[in-house]
C-alpha cells in the first residue's frame, strides 16, 4: 500500500520573470539577470526581484519623499533609484537638483526635476553608470498606502481593531445604531 504524500508545500511561490509582456521590461530583466550573475552585488539582485513584481508591489513615489530621503547626510550627489513611478507633489514649492532613475516619471514630475537642473536616467543608463550600485540610494513607495489596505486586518468591531468596514453608505442607518447610540439598545 502506497503513502499519499502531501505535495501542498513543495512549490515555492515566487516570480522568476515578470507577468507583463512589455518588451522593454523584458530587455531590462535580461540586462539585470546578466549583472546579477556577473557582479556579486546585492543591489542588482534587488533590482531584478523588483522588476518581476506586480504593480501593487511597485507603488509610486512622490518627489517630496525622494527629496526628504536625499536630504539625509552623506546622500548628496547620489542617484535615487526607484523601481516604479515617480509622481509630482504640488504641496512642495521648490525642489533641489536631483539625479533620479525610475521605470516611469509622470510629465509634471519630469518637467519639475529637469527645471531644477536635475537629471532623469533609465535603468540601462544606470547599469553603465553604476553596474554594482555604487553611489546610489534605493527607495520604494509605501506598499500599504492603498485604500484597499485599510480594509485588511482584524474584523472591524473587534477590540483594538482599526480596520475600515465595508459600508454601503455613511448615513445614519448604516452601522450607527445598536451599540453606537444609547437610544438604540446600548452604547459601547
Swiss-Prot record:
Q: Does the keyword Cell division apply?
A: no
Task: List the Pfam families.
Answer: Ribosomal_L18 (PF17135)
GO biological-process terms attached to the record: translation
Q: Which UniProt keywords apply?
A: Cytoplasm, Ribonucleoprotein, Ribosomal protein
Which portions of the sequence form the region Disordered? 147-188
Q: Which residues form the signal peptide?
A: none
Q: Report the subcellular localization.
A: Cytoplasm
**Gene Ontology CC annotations of this record:** cytosolic large ribosomal subunit
Q: Identify a single GO molecular function assigned to this protein.
A: RNA binding
Biased amino acid composition, Basic residues: 161-171, 178-188
Q: Which InterPro entries match?
A: Ribosomal_eL18 (IPR000039), Ribosomal_eL18/eL18-A/B/_CS (IPR021132), Ribosomal_uL15/eL18 (IPR021131), Ribosomal_uL15/eL18_sf (IPR036227)
User: Family per UniProt?
Assistant: Belongs to the eukaryotic ribosomal protein eL18 family.
- Name the PANTHER family for this protein: 60S RIBOSOMAL PROTEIN L18, LARGE RIBOSOMAL SUBUNIT PROTEIN EL18
Q: What is this protein called?
A: Large ribosomal subunit protein eL18
Source organism (scientific name): Diaphorina citri
Q: Name the lineage.
A: Eukaryota, Metazoa, Ecdysozoa, Arthropoda, Hexapoda
